[in-house]
Amino acid sequence: METRCLYLLLVCVLSVNHATADNGSIKKMKMQYTGFPLLKFQICVSUGYRRVFEEYTRVLTQRYPDIRIEGENFLPQPLYRHIASFLSVFKLVVIGLIILGKNPFTYLHIETPGIWLWAQENKIYACTMVFFLSNMIENQCMSTGAFEVTLNDVPVWSKLQSGHLPSMQQLVQILENEMKLSVHMDSLPHRRA
């Protein structure tokens, strides 16, 4: 009975996974053939660039109604993501051990450090300190400072390379130049080889 339930669960998971994979490829195909330019922003959400992206999107949508605009979080390198994930779990374990009054050093046959004894005597301060210190390190690991802009998968602006955000005028000028260039390239006669 148990194996039948596991088999049924496995079949359900695989069918849902297959259905979502097909749906994603159909959506991607539909978006490929819309013909409208795609302006894509990759931003550091933890750096506070979401508002800048929303403001730019609002202005650019009014000025260029035919442009599709997408935004996504620019992820840090995998090493930093793994460090941040580890810290988020590790801090909860440490806070749990402090609250429960458990001493993990006795299991490791290590002498208990003085800071652990202090944490056991001052649980609220210790838990608060562990929480905020860990969050600070996690945020530092996840912050990329990125504000990358591509038009039809061609990079048009990179804060990581330039060191600053584009102004609205700069972004509009770049878009107009790229649009003129693409219209000019489309109007050239095609040569046959």
UniProtKB/Swiss-Prot annotation:
<dbReference type="InterPro" id="IPR036249">
    <property type="entry name" value="Thioredoxin-like_sf"/>
</dbReference>
<keyword id="KW-0560">Oxidoreductase</keyword>
<protein>
    <recommendedName>
        <fullName>Thioredoxin reductase-like selenoprotein T1b</fullName>
        <ecNumber>1.8.1.9</ecNumber>
    </recommendedName>
</protein>
<feature type="signal peptide">
    <location>
        <begin position="1"/>
        <end position="21"/>
    </location>
</feature>
<dbReference type="InterPro" id="IPR011893">
    <property type="entry name" value="Selenoprotein_Rdx-typ"/>
</dbReference>
<feature type="cross-link" description="Cysteinyl-selenocysteine (Cys-Sec)">
    <location>
        <begin position="44"/>
        <end position="47"/>
    </location>
</feature>
<comment type="similarity">
    <text>Belongs to the SelWTH family. Selenoprotein T subfamily.</text>
</comment>
<dbReference type="InterPro" id="IPR019389">
    <property type="entry name" value="Selenoprotein_T"/>
</dbReference>
<dbReference type="GO" id="GO:0005789">
    <property type="term" value="C:endoplasmic reticulum membrane"/>
</dbReference>
<dbReference type="GO" id="GO:0004791">
    <property type="term" value="F:thioredoxin-disulfide reductase (NADPH) activity"/>
</dbReference>
<dbReference type="Pfam" id="PF10262">
    <property type="entry name" value="Rdx"/>
</dbReference>
<dbReference type="GO" id="GO:0045454">
    <property type="term" value="P:cell redox homeostasis"/>
</dbReference>
<comment type="function">
    <text>Selenoprotein with thioredoxin reductase-like oxidoreductase activity.</text>
</comment>
<keyword id="KW-0732">Signal</keyword>
<keyword id="KW-0256">Endoplasmic reticulum</keyword>
<keyword id="KW-0521">NADP</keyword>
<keyword id="KW-0712">Selenocysteine</keyword>
<keyword id="KW-0472">Membrane</keyword>
<keyword id="KW-0676">Redox-active center</keyword>
